Amino acid sequence: MRELIKEAVNSLDSALELRKLIIKKLNEKKLKESDIIEIVDAVDDLSLEEIQKLGSNLRTFPMGCDLVEIAVGPCSSSLTLIQFIENCILTDYMGFPIHICSYAVADIAEKEGLKPIEVLKMVLENVDVPIDIDHFGMYGPMRFPKEITHCYGDCYFKGPPFKGCPRNRIHKRLIEKEKEHADEFEDWIKLASTLCINVVEEQGGEEHAAPLEEMKIVAETAKKYGKGLEGIFHIGDGYDDLITGIKACIDLDVDVFVVEGAPFNRAKNRLKAFAKAIAVSRILVKGGVVATNGAYEDECRVGLRSGLNTILTGFPLNHHGYMCGYSPKTAKRGNFGLRRVMRIIKEEIRAGNVNATFIDKDMVKAIALGNRFLKGNIYPYSIGGFYLGDAHWAAIKESNLCKKLKINKTIDDISAEKVGLIGGRYISWAIAEKAEEVYISDTDSWVEKATIKILNEAGINAYPCNGDDKKVLEADKAYITTFIPNIALKILNKLRDSKVELLI
C-alpha cells in the first residue's frame, strides 16, 4: 500500500484504487494493525503539502464525502429548558446536525422535574435535522458532578501538551444517577440518528473517558437499530496513540472518525500530526466522513486542507463552543464557537484551499430525497466495491426530515432497459444496477470517469457521454438525477425533450 499512497498524492485513479482496497479489507474484516501501521508510516514520510494533497484527493467523490459541514452543540447544564430548545430550533433552521451532550439534557430534565427522554422528545418535536448523541453510556446519558459539567475548559485554555487536568479533575461519573433512568437506554438510541463513542481509554486516557467495554455495548446497540456510529480518539503522540485509536474504532465498526487535537495533540510537529491524522483517517474510515471535535484554529485550517469534513462546535456555555476554532489563552467556556468556525470554513473555501462544498439546507434535503428515492438502500450497501452513499446519507436517513418528505418516484418506478442519466453520483449507480445499459453524463469529468469504472467493474454496461447531456437522449428514457430543484429544472429547460424526466 505504501507505493499506492505515494501515487495517490497526485493521482485520483490511485486514490480510487486505494479506497477500494481498504473498503474490501474492512468489509471482509481483514484489515490488520500492521496495515494501519504501514499507512501511518507511509503518510508520515510525506511532506505537509503532500499530506494535504493526499487528504484532499481522498475527500473527492467517490473516495470520500466531498462536503464540509458544521455539527452544533446546543446544550449546557447551565441552560434552562427553553434556552436549550431555542438553540435547537435555530440550529435546525440553519440546517446543521444537532450534537446532543446527553449529560446536559439529563441535568436540564432534572431541574424541570422531567425524565431525560422527555426532553429529547421535545427536541425531536421541534427539529428535522439529524440528532447525534454523545456522552452516552451503558445506562443512558452519563451524569457528572458540577465541577465537570461547568468546567471552564482549562486544558484547552492552557494548551498542549496535555499532562492531566490542570485542576486535577478526573472523569468522575454519578453512576447511581445514571441507573435511575437506565430503562430509557434503548429508547434514546431508537430516537437518535447517530451515536458517538469515545475510545480514548484504549489510548491510555482512563481518566478522560468511559471503559471501552462500555462503549462496545453502546456501539452494538446502535448497530442493532441501524444507527450511525462515530468514534472519538486523541492524536496524542501522533504515532502510537493514533494507531491505537484508529484500530479501536475499526474494531467497533465505526462509520465516522472524530479526531481530537488541541491539548490532546502532543506531537512535536503539531500541524503535520493533525494533517496526518486527518489524511490517515480519510484512507481508513469506513463511512467516508472525517470530523474533529477538538482543534485550535490552525489545526482547523490545516485539517480542512487535508480532507476534513466536519467541525464540531457549539453555542455559548456548551463545551464544544470553545473546543474548535480558538487558540490557547482564548479557548474557554462561554465562547460562541459556531460563528468562529463558520468564518474559518468560509475563508478556507474562498481561498481555494478546500476542494469541497459547504453543505446547505438544499443539499441536506436533496440527500433526504435521495434516501427516499432509494428506499433506504444505501451505505453500507455497495456497488462495484464502493458504498452507495456515505455516513452523511446514513445519518440523514434516520432524521425527521427524511421521514417527513414525500417523493413522486422511487427506484422501483424505473423500468426502461436503455437509460440515460444526467448526473453520475449515487442515484445514477442505483438506477444503473437495474437497467440493461446506461449512458451517463456529468459536468465533472472525474465523477463521470470514476462512476463508469465502478459500474463496469460491477458488470454493468455503462457508457460515458463526456459531459454532453444531449448524448443521453440516445437512450429509451433519460433521468435528471439531482434532487436540488433549481439545478434539475435548469437542466430540464436546457434539454427540452419529452424523453427526459425529473426524479423529484
UniProtKB/Swiss-Prot annotation:
This is Uncharacterized protein MJ0787. It comes from the Archaea. It comes from Methanocaldococcus jannaschii (strain ATCC 43067 / DSM 2661 / JAL-1 / JCM 10045 / NBRC 100440). To M.thermoautotrophicum MTH1137.
